[in-house]
From Swiss-Prot:
Histone H3-H4 chaperone that plays a role in maintenance of chromatin structure during RNA polymerase II transcription elongation thereby repressing transcription initiation from cryptic promoters. Mediates the reassembly of nucleosomes onto the promoters of at least a selected set of genes during repression; the nucleosome reassembly is essential for transcriptional repression. Essential for viability. This is Transcription elongation factor SPT6. The gene is SPT6. It comes from Debaryomyces hansenii (strain ATCC 36239 / CBS 767 / BCRC 21394 / JCM 1990 / NBRC 0083 / IGC 2968). Belongs to the SPT6 family. Residues 1-16, 151-165, 183-206 have a biased composition (Basic and acidic residues).
Length: 1439
């Protein structure tokens, strides 16, 4: 689109923007979090807002428009003589002097919640300028108009009295009131009460970038409420008649603010709905004082964004494409920043600016047009992010410029502030100013000579007070004696660095002092006014002062930052705790990482994030250093030292080196942290991008396409599942029609995997279901899924049923289908169904159906619309994992990635707006349409319902009926689909056929012109055809394929040459839409591949379950030759993993002499995995297991610290040898000279309950028995050995045994038996405490009125269990500990011999526990608390 065209469009959309900033201030000083010194900005910001008046803006700033400003509009007064005073000060002076203050021009105060009668006496209400009947127009009108209108209403003076009183009544205490004061107080109180009844006014402090003329346009569109003036007056009279019986008149008085916020009904939410800026833009710019840049400032942003994106794409557009690439980026920046176009709009309707075409002449003389894609949707989102970043940087830089101007600085180091392009560079300059000119800044504040400086500035700069005193003291002569200033030193470093430190000369030479440092300090300390009389303290002060000057010098900082950026080296130092990291740890590959460059970490972003995660856990320390530091430091020092050779000169050089070391110690530490933080942000961004890419693949798929139909047609679906797949599990099914209606449910108690008879019965019942229930409407696809790998058997059974009974695809609506194929049986993606089955949505829709039936509905809905099913999860989608390293970034970043993917796909598909009005399930899509958001979407639906009778007939109605503002209409209109009835033979003139296409209304004339050219119509014919029903209608009647004959390239050239409009891609898009409107352009429905099904049902990936992976397996069957008892060998073994993967162990993979028994758990290594059949082959050979235990990652000799690894191994071995040397041997078959770790490794492949005896670290009179509680869970019990006469006794847990065999049988195995009983109890759940917590939370959310409790292993104390319970959904999870003993269980000091008794005892104990809390509450509170409901609720524990 040509520049003139864009400017014309912008003028039409916002003709009032030119004067938007005439009455606005610019002074908003930044608050950065880069460094401790960043608090300066926060302090400066607070002074600006309340104490000092802004100077007039310069002409360039007056032309800028403000967006999303977060501060109050600056006060303006009518009297020029009062301009020197702040408005608040003026009003305060006038109030104290008894004068009547002039009416406030536009003073706005923060809206506070109005309190009811009960709380009115406790807290003072603040209504301020927001009360009154004038409505929105009064708030935003100019001062003169405001005066007139309020005078007409007869309340100008009263309103201002109320403003002053509200603001200062708590600030000024008067000793006594006169009669007039009391009368005035009474009237003001009445006014406040009247204002409270009217409800709060609109808080315009949140309206950024909205000038008065723009607001006037908004009120013309939405009304100002003046037509209801009579009703408000009548209500007021009625309320006054009722006396004290006041009824609440605002939402704030009826609902809690939290509830209003949840429903998006707060004042801020309404402002977002009103402002003519896309809601997503408002959301991301909320913390910015967003400025509409123009001219050179806009070009600066465009260049900044283009350079960053060009570097990130690593030269993908080098050569002749570099310039077109940067031009495309610049254009997108303009679209986003100035035109407020959202990404989908730019991608769809400004695609010509994202392409570069060139004409290539062929050898035969013909010309080929080659098109290069410069930017993709991911790039547009990145530009959007960079726009936010730049404006944050720009805002901080402008604040620094204002501070420099206020201080009137003449300093070479601050002159180039406009060229600073990084946040750290701006922060470095601010630190320099704060340090160097701290005295001037304090004086500036004290004198109030300028505006925009923070009230807390003196407090902030007190840390520089000592340096200020030294600068003004005789002691500063010693700083000057270093012979070179920090500024000169910085210039030397900058010059030498630019020449790579290869030139011998320097810009500034270092002068040598005639006195030695010691003599000079002693002489200065003799001065009466010297700060430090002690020479040692004085020397330290001098050193620190010069070091601080070097530390704060921006040029020195720039050199350090540049060096770290180019030569940084990241390494890991293992802590004592981190030495426990083994080959199976997620941090194994970073344990001894060294010499990692920033480029290495950016290529593998998860590596740095795992490093930082391990650092946060105290396992490692991540160190960022620079390569060859000593050599680099020497080069820097050469810019500081003198060339003299005397003893005095050497002493001064030593002092200089000492000071430089002091400064560089802080500098490198600071820059190291900055570098680490910058790398972290970049790696998080890359992880988030990968999450977005993976999630896009999930939702970029059309519904499953029925046989014979076009892509995008929704199928009839039959979903089947038997859940866990136990033998007694029923098979449940749900049938969904293409409309989404759940038509039939199926249930068979005959599980087909039980036996052959059950399989036959199941097939017969399913056949009967097809013949009777599905006779009129056959499914187009059968989807099968479940909770685990056993579902593969059901899948095979259903597929066999289809083949055996020749169940063919649905062809009732098709013609000429001779041999229809069999109906397709596919695996269903279960992640959305798993969350749906326990959701509130499922409970409401199918309250009378079992959980598995809801699960089947979720499966079927996914097949009909993956996009809608993911969208329906809401924030629950965060529980799903789309990328293995997703957990390394915050949920906010994950949600942003997911939401951007939603926006892309939903706008690609479009939303049938009238369906969204009728169906909340479809309405979920609307907030993600370009320009809209949850608030604007809800407002749009509400306006359509109220103004148009629940149907939007045309896109143009959005503007004509004032349903949308201009910018929002431009962004969203083409993505709102309004289909027409293709069966009508007559043309309805009220229907715009192009509203059923992706063509934007701005291109409707272009589409009609193309249609006319395709029909060979001239202008007269066009007018006639328009009268007969329209050109588009005529094209559809004659055949849309006629547009295929148009020469779009020539047409595009004509548009560009004559009108300056780039429309090549737009023309092609219009042509496609005319031929096939809103065609399904998503990818086809993705049928899960074998490895995806394997991961879905087992939780294993192709990386976690592959060759040489060690896994525990349970022996199901052992094949052995029992005829030869002496030499019998195990021929084979059938095994199963915990995830129900079936496996075989052949004879060659079984060690000789091993004894295997059914039910035994052994450690095995995977030889081959067959993902499609959920089977694998395993080996038990020691050599294979050792191979599987080896590290799975490559150790680069240049990037792995082998020396440290070997040293740690040697220390560990020496420690173990020393431990073994202290131990003794006893004669017992279970005794082994093991350490605790060796004992655990030995027991790992053994059965649960097996144990070993081993030496104890307590001494020779002790032993330790280690027994296997569960997989990877072992309990170590200390045994005390006492000699009693001729025999011995063994004491464990205060129980005595005569020998070790008795101890093992009566104590260890008894405990193991109770552990096994616990694990078999239905209230027990496997998994970590966090996993069990998640299950308990989700269960109580699904059953909010039920109580629930559950047992799980205490992984921190093996042999103990955790009892977790929730009284109801609103109470926190409480955890009690249960100890397993040889004679039962112990809970809260009580013993229970069985699980039944334990559960009953827990319930009784809990009731006593609740009663005790209630009794204590009664004794401490004046009013009794009724806990009876809580106690009685915890009666049933079923789930």
């Amino acid at each position: 689109m040509a520049k003139e065209d864009i400017e014309e469009e912008r003028e039409i959309r916002n003709d009032a923007s030119e004067n938007s900033s005439d009455e606005e201030g610019d002074d908003v000083l930044d608050s950065s979090e880069e460094d401790d010194d960043d608090d300066d900005e926060e302090a400066i910001k607070r002074v600006r807002e309340g104490f000092i008046v802004d100077d007039d803006e310069d002409e360039s700033q007056k032309r800028k428009r403000r967006k999303h400003k977060k501060r109050k509009r600056e006060e303006r007064t009518n009297d020029d003589e009062n301009n020197a005073l702040d408005q608040d000060d003026l009003e305060l002076l006038m109030e104290n002097s008894g004068a009547r203050p002039q009416p406030s021009s536009n003073k706005l105060k923060r809206l506070k919640r109005a309190y009811t009668e009960d709380t009115e006496g406790a807290e003072e209400e603040e209504i301020g300028a927001k009360s009154g009947r004038g409505g929105l127009t009064d708030i935003f009108s100019d001062e003169d108009n405001n005066e007139e209108e309020r005078a007409d209403l007869g309340e100008t003076r009263v309103d201002d009295d109320r403003n002053i009183l509200d603001e200062f009544e708590d600030f000024i205490e008067e000793d006594e009131y006169s009669d007039e004061d009391e009368e005035r107080q009474r009237k003001l109180t009445q006014q406040r009460e009247r204002a409270q009844k009217k409800g709060p006014r609109l808080d315009t402090s949140k309206l950024s970038n909205v000038d008065r003329e723009s607001l006037q346009q908004l009120f013309e569109v939405f009304g100002n409420g003046a037509e209801y003036e009579w009703a408000l007056e009548a209500q007021e009279m009625e309320d006054e008649g009722n006396g004290e019986n006041l009824e609440p008149t605002s939402l704030d008085e009826v609902f809690e603010h939290a509830e209003l916020k949840e429903r998006m009904l707060t004042e801020e939410d309404n402002l977002i709905r009103i402002v003519d800026i896309p809601e997503r833009f408002q959301k991301y710019r909320a913390n910015l004082n967003y400025i509409d840049l123009e001219g050179e400032e806009l070009k600066s942003e465009q260049g900044w964004v283009a350079n960053i994106l060009f570097m990130e794409k690593q030269g993908s557009f080098s050569g002749f494409l570099e310039e077109p690439f940067k031009e495309a980026v610049s254009k997108v920046v303009e679209f986003i920043s100035k035109d407020v176009y959202e990404v989908p709009f730019i991608w769809t309707h400004r695609r010509d600016f994202l392409l570069y075409s060139e004409e290539i002449k062929n050898e035969d003389g013909s010309v080929t047009n080659s098109v290069h894609k410069l930017l993709f949707e991911d790039d547009l989102w990145r530009i959007f992010q960079l726009d936010i970043e730049y404006h944050s940087l720009y805002e901080k830089r402008v604040n620094i410029e204002k501070l420099i101007e206020s201080l009137n600085l003449d300093d070479d180091l601050v002159k180039d502030v406009k060229s600073l392009e990084t946040m750290v560079a701006i922060q470095d300059l601010q630190d320099y100013i704060n340090f160097t000119y701290s005295t001037e800044i304090r004086k500036l504040y004290d004198d109030k000579e300028t505006e925009g400086i923070d009230a807390n500035i003196t407090k902030k700069h007190s840390k520089y007070a000592i340096f200020e005193r030294i600068k003004s003291n005789v002691l500063y002569d010693a700083v000057n004696a270093f012979g070179i200033s920090a500024k000169e030193f910085g210039e030397n470093v900058q010059d030498q660095s630019s020449k790579k430190f290869e030139v011998p000369y320097r810009i500034h030479a270092t002068d040598d002092h005639i006195e030695s440092p010691e003599d000079l300090i002693e002489r200065l300390c003799e001065d009466d006014e010297v700060l430090f009389k002690d020479p040692k303290n004085a020397l330290n002060a001098v050193r620190k002062t010069f070091a601080e000057e070097i530390f704060h010098n921006p040029k020195i900082r720039h050199e350090v930052r540049t060096t770290f950026k180019d030569f940084a080296s990241i390494r890991v130092a293992v802590t004592e705790k981190g030495k426990a990291i083994d080959n199976h740890s997620p941090y194994a590959d970073i344990k001894y990482a060294i010499n990692r460059s920033p480029a290495d970490l950016v290529r593998n972003p998860d590596v740095l994030l795992r490093m930082l995660e391990a650092e946060a856990a105290g396992l490692v320390v991540v160190k960022v250093e620079t390569k060859d530091y000593d050599s680099w430091f020497q080069c820097i020092f050469n810019c500081l030292k003198s060339d003299g050779s005397s003893e005095i000169f050497e002493k001064w050089n030593k002092e200089r080196e000492f000071v430089l070391n002091m400064a560089f110690k802080r500098l490198t530490s600071m820059v190291s942290m900055n570098t680490k933080e910058d790398l972290r942000r970049e790696c998080e961004r890359l992880i988030a991008s990968e999450v977005r890419r993976r999630f896009l693949a999930r939702i970029d798929q059309a519904p499953f396409t029925p046989f014979g139909f076009d892509k995008g047609t929704k199928p009839n679906v039959l979903a089947l599942s038997f859940g866990k797949g136990d033998f007694d599990s029923a098979v449940i099914g749900a049938f969904l029609r293409e409309s989404g209606k759940v038509d039939e449910f199926f249930k068979s108690e005959d599980n087909p995997i039980r036996d052959r008879e059950s399989e036959d019965k199941f097939s017969g019942q399913l056949k009967e279901f097809f013949d009777k229930n599905l006779r009129n409407q056959k499914p187009d696809v059968i989807v099968v899924s479940g909770y685990n790998a056993i579902s593969k058997k059901l899948f095979d059974s259903v597929k066999s049923f289809v083949e055996t009974n020749n169940v063919t695809a649905n062809t009732e609506e098709l013609t000429d289908v001779q041999n229809p194929p069999l109906i397709q049986v596919i695996w269903g993606q279960s992640e959305t169904a798993t969350l749906f089955q326990n959701s509130e949505r499922a409970r409401i829709e199918f309250s009378d159906k079992p959980t598995l039936a809801k699960y089947c509905v979720g499966l079927a809905r996914y097949v009909q619309s993956p996009l809608l099913e993911y969208l329906s999860l809401g924030e629950g989608i965060l529980s799903l994992t789309f990328f293995e390293h997703q957990k390394l970034i915050s949920t906010d970043l994950v949600m942003e990635a997911i939401e951007s993917a939603y926006v892309d796909i939903i706008n690609m598909v479009g939303v049938e707006i009238n369906e969204a009005i009728r169906d909340p399930y479809i309405a979920q899509l609307l907030p993600y349409v370009a320009g809209l958001g949850p608030r604007k979407a809800s407002g749009l639906l509400r306006n359509i319902n109220s103004k148009l009778g629940s149907t939007l007939a045309n896109r143009s109605d959005l503007i004509e009926n004032e349903l949308s503002t201009a910018n929002i209409f431009i962004n969203c209109s083409s993505f709102l689909n309004i289909p027409y009835d293709e069966g009508l033979s007559m043309r309805d003139s009220s229907v715009e056929l192009l509203d059923a296409t992706r063509i934007h209304p701005e291109d409707y004339d272009l589409a009609r012109k193309m249609a006319a050219d395709a029909l060979d119509l001239d202008e007269e014919d066009m007018a006639h055809v328009e009268e007969q029903g329209g050109i588009i209608y005529q094209l559809m009647q004659d055949g849309v394929n006629k547009v295929d004959d148009l020469n779009l390239t020539a047409y595009g050239k004509e548009l560009e040459s004559k009108f300056g409009k780039k429309k090549y891609a737009t023309l092609q898009s219009i042509k496609e839409e005319l031929v096939n409107n809103f065609e399904e352009i998503r990818r086809s429905f993705h049928i899960l591949e074998s490895h995806e099904v394997f991961h879905m049902l087992t939780g294993e990936t192709t990386e976690s379950f592959t060759r040489n992976t060690i896994v525990p397996v349970t022996v199901n069957k052992v094949g052995q030759n029992f005829r030869d008892f002496e030499n019998s060998k195990i021929k084979f073994a059938k095994v199963t993993t915990s995830s129900f993967i079936q496996g075989n162990i052949e004879e060659a993979s079984i060690p000789q002499g091993i004894d295997l028994a059914q039910g035994q758990v052994v450690q095995a290594v995977v030889l081959d995995a067959y993902y499609d059949s959920f089977t694998a082959s395993f080996s038990l050979l020691e050599a294979d297991i050792q191979k599987g235990a080896a590290p799975k990652f490559h150790k680069d000799p240049l990037k792995w610290n082998f020396e440290a690894e070997q040293a740690d191994k040697q220390k560990e071995m020496a420690k173990e040898r020393a431990q073994l040397a202290k131990t003794r041997n006893i004669q017992h078959p279970l005794f082994h000279n093991f350490s605790y770790k060796q004992a655990e490794e030995f027991l790992a492949p053994q059965a649960v309950g097996d144990c070993v005896l081993r030496p104890s670290s307590k001494g020779p009179n002790y032993l330790t028995v280690t027994w296997k509680v569960s997989n990877n869970l072992f309990q170590h019990l200390s045994i005390q050995e006492n000699t009693q006469g001729m025999g011995k006794e063994y004491i464990v847990e205060h129980k005595k045994y005569a020998d070790l065999d008795q101890l093992i049988f009566q104590h260890v195995q008894a405990i193991a038996k109770h552990v096994d009983e616990m694990c078999r109890h239905p209230k027990f759940r496997e998994g970590t405490m966090s996993e069990v917590n998640e299950w308990l939370e989700s269960y109580t959310k699904a059953n909010p009125k039920n109580s629930a409790y559950v047992f799980c292993f205490d992984h921190k104390a093996p042999g103990w269990f955790l009892l977790l319970f929730k009284v109801n959904v609103n109470t926190p999870i409480t955890t009690w500990h249960v100890k397993t003993e040889c004679d039962g269980y112990r809970l809260k000091g009580f013993s229970y011999p069985s699980m039944l008794r334990l559960c009953n005892g827990f319930k009784q104990t809990f009731k006593s526990y609740v009663k005790g809390i209630a009794d204590r509450s009664r004794s401490t509170k004046p009013a009794p608390v009724n806990n009876q409901a809580q106690a009685s609720t915890y009666g049933g524990y079923g789930y």
